[in-house]
């Protein structure tokens, strides 16, 4: 078809679907929204003094650049906790780390932790003023690897090491790749890259969208 013709056909199909029977009524959306409560956000500045001071620390800045994402409420950020240390099995965390993360969530994120298919954790409501202290705590726990969305942020299924359905090993490949690209400057130079590894055709590692 070619990209231009395909784009036109998608637009034509959308015109037929838009406003049709699959469109959600606003009353349904409002009803679902009513089942969720928002945290008690404070009115905070966009750039607090704590963040300005911490910006002089290159380790903090590298982590902030790769692990901290915009929030819809001013003064807050979303923080992704990478579970992809160099040489470690992707997505693994110890019981001690999870206990500590639960405490950090209570202290900095209204008690909320989220788990994504990327095999990382997220603290969804962190005040920007708290980012420097949170970074120090995560660094002590080994959870401040600044590689989110980079070449070493690899998704891998358990593979043949743990899964009876697999016909190939996934984890050792992921571990070796993280060692190969362990230098953070190299990973930054490569830029945003998603490597997904599956040990069989069931594609639990989402290799088809890597």
Where are these regions (language model features)?
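Peripheral terminal and linker regions in Fe-S/redox and tRNA-modifying enzymes
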Residues: 1-210
């Amino acid at each position: 078809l070619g990209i231009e013709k395909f784009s036109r056909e998608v637009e034509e199909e959308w015109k037929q679907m838009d406003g049709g029977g699959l469109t959600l009524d606003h009353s349904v959306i409002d009803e679902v929204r009513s089942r969720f409560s928002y945290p008690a956000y404070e009115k905070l500045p966009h750039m607090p003094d704590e963040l300005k001071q911490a910006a002089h620390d290159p380790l903090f800045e590298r982590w902030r650049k790769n692990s901290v994402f915009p929030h819809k409420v001013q003064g807050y950020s979303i923080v992704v906790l990478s579970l992809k240390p160099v040489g470690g099995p992707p997505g693994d965390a110890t019981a001690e780390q999870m206990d500590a993360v639960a405490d950090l969530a209570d202290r900095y994120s209204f008690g909320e932790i989220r788990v994504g298919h990327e095999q990382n954790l997220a603290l969804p409501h962190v005040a920007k003023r708290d980012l420097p202290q949170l970074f120090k705590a995560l660094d002590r726990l080994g959870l401040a690897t600044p590689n989110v969305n980079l070449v070493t942020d690899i998704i891998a299924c358990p593979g043949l090491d743990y899964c009876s359905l697999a016909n190939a090993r996934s984890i050792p490949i992921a571990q070796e790749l993280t060692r190969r690209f362990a230098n953070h400057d190299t990973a930054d130079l490569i830029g945003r890259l998603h490597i997904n590894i599956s040990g069989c055709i069931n594609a639990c590692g989402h290799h088809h969208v890597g």
